[in-house]
Amino acid sequence: TYGGYVTVKFDHPVQNKRGSDLRIKGNGFYSSGDPKYGKETIGGSFEPGIVYVGVGDDVNTCKWYELAGSEYYTDEIHDFSITYHKPVAEEGEHSQMFSSFDNYIKWEASWTDKNGERRDSTGYHMKISFHRQSFWPLWEEGETLTFKGGKLPNNAVNYGTEASQNWVLYRYAKDAYGYVDASLNTDDYSTFDIDWAVDEQGNHVDLEEINFVKVVNGTFQYCGWLGETSTEVTGFQDLHLVEGYDENPIIITPRTSTGLSVVKTDSKFAAKDDSYYDLMGRRVATPQKGIYIRNGKKIIFK
């Protein structure tokens, strides 16, 4: 589910050279029976994960940067936070289809929506009857787990009924890039360019090399009998070690950035001598809650 991650370190720094630098494999595949798009489908089983790269000698102290994928500047939520509570039992009351415990793992989430409004939600992950093992990490001694970061849009559609479900999990577009387990392993779109690195404000960062790679499950959605959507990771590869690759590297042209950086602040801290504009380009004398532009940056007043 959202926030689960795997972190790896190569036995050498991965250089940032021309073109894609990494290939990260998942187990995505296309549907052979998409009831809506048929053979033209870009759907199947794709469970996108966000990639972060770390610079430093120690995984606990290194500086992390997100690789901005195709949805970063449009539909990604950048401040999603969720807390999961350790289940009190492995079986319990259940009335939902495919469930062996309806109120299995409690969760509480919060985020800022596109209008700058703070949202929150709470609920439970049910335990799928097909999976008897505990969903909770057995090595975790605490009562809660909290994850924070980017969250990608949901990508699953059920074309069946509640009793006979037919889930298709789509790529965001034919040229969507920047996410693990979101294309075939043989596609160019399963490769990643360190040049896509951005800091916490969404500003481009020039990195000569990276030491760590982290893949984080980027969606928060439940798909009936399939359960929660979870990124699958099956391998990492430094492309520059492939013979002849640097002579003809994979080039993925990133989506055009909005040129805006995100700064979250309270409206009472609005600078009186600065000009603020709404998203229609109109000057605003006194910003209230919402999203504004100041000096080329996106300002979210809460």
Locate each region found by the language model:
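Residue-level detector of functionally pivotal "anchor" positions at catalytic/ligand-binding pockets or at interdomain
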Residues: 254-280
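A domain-level signal for the mature, folded cores of soluble proteins
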Residues: 1-47, 69-256
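Tryptophan-centered short beta-strand motifs
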Residues: 60-67
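Surface-exposed, flexible coil segments in extracellular/virion-facing regions
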Residues: 284-288
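C-terminal tail/sorting-segment detector
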Residues: 291-302
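Short loop/turn segments immediately following beta-strands, especially the blade-tip
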Residues: 55-59
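Beta-strand signatures of extracellular beta-sandwich domains
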Residues: 50-52, 275
